[in-house]
Amino acid sequence: MKQYFIILGSVFVLLSNFAASGQKKITNETDEQKRQRMAWWTNDRFGMFIHWGLYALPARHEWVKNRERLTNEQYQVYFDQFNPDLYNPVLWAKQAKEAGMKYAVLTSKHHEGFCLFDSKYTDYKATKTQVKRDLVKEFVEAFRAEGLEVG
């Protein structure tokens, strides 16, 4: 049994070395360039991450379709009902700035594929719901108007 674990451990170490050596650097960024690029995080670390979309309608969790094994037909009701009449990114941006935030990130498309923005690649998007607007565009414009970074 001891020999089995030694062999298994050796195989694991060998394979992990191959995995590490197979990683490719995707940029030619120097350490100094990375430090400069990430300096904003040190200076502007207070921000807002908004995780919001079609999955908000069932009011349980963002993985509702997957975890509750909803069919496309069952989930369609949320697409049909989607009309965020209280969506007010101008107010959100003003409040974020007043709170001292420096940036905001919006989940523009979640795992189920619903887009809060207009896209030529799908009809599964906010512009095809009752709201008929590009919600990401409104978000970006509102936050930039307040001088906040957007992601």
Each PLM stretch: what is its role?
Residues 1-24:
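Bacterial Sec-dependent N-terminal signal peptides
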Residues 22-151:
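Mature catalytic domains of secreted/periplasmic carbohydrate-active enzymes
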